[in-house]
Amino acid sequence: MARFSSAEVLDAVLRYPVVPVFYHADVAYAKRILQACYDGGLRVFEFTNRGANAFDVFSQLQTFVQEQCPDMLLGIGTIYTAQDAERFIEAGADFVVQPVTTAEVAAACQHNDVAWLPGAMTLNEVYNATQLGAKLVKIFPGNVVGPGYIKALRGPMPNVKLMVTGGVEPTNESVSEWFGAGVNVVGMGSQLFKNADDTQALVAQISGLMQFVNSLPK
């Protein structure tokens, strides 16, 4: 089961608002990436349920985190069903991320006091997610709507916590634009891991990025 309550996870995500979104079928490689993210200063990591052996890899990563990266929150992404949510929660998922919003997954997370991050795009979808209890809503895909959309959404919904994924680049310019538009958290996938084979370079890149993010006005 999760090591942290839903409220504790939400607080941590807002304090460490850069979330890597990652999947790889090779456990050893996934461990190296997770360790590099940890060494670079990240404390929230989303492993996605996108491969046939995702559960096995996730389970081994969870053990690795508890032994080597105890302050890292490890969550599972790309969850569509309550059955999958329950399975990964049982394996220790600290949070559950969806590309969509389903009441069944919301209920499974809430029953276990596990943070639930549903996916939405339209104003109506964001509102419906909050009505189901979401404290942080994922806007996806970000590259389709752009930062201008976030600014517009903030007009009628100034208080909803938002995380954007898809199209966020690991550059000062990109993250400054998104945070300036009003997001609370950014998720980064393939853009962050383009040269991931060089883990020392990845650590340095993440460290510099986190220093910049922490310098932005809150």
Where are these regions (language model features)?
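Glycine-enriched alpha-helix->loop->beta-strand junction motifs that scaffold or abut catalytic
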Residues: 38-43, 89-96, 111-117, 131-136, ...
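Catalytic cores of alpha/beta
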Residues: 81-91, 125-132, 149, 168-186
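Hydrophobic faces of well-ordered beta-strands that scaffold small-molecule active sites
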Residues: 17-22, 45-47, 74-77, 96-98, ...
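Histidine/lysine/aspartate-rich catalytic loop segments that bind and position anionic ligands
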Residues: 99-145
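Conserved N-terminal beta1-alpha1 strand-loop-helix module at the mouth
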Residues: 1-83, 87-91, 180, 199-218
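Short, ordered loop/turn segments at secondary-structure junctions
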Residues: 49-50, 79, 100-102, 121-122, ...
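Glycine-rich phosphate-binding active-site loops on the catalytic face of alpha/beta enzymes
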Residues: 95-105, 139-146, 182-202
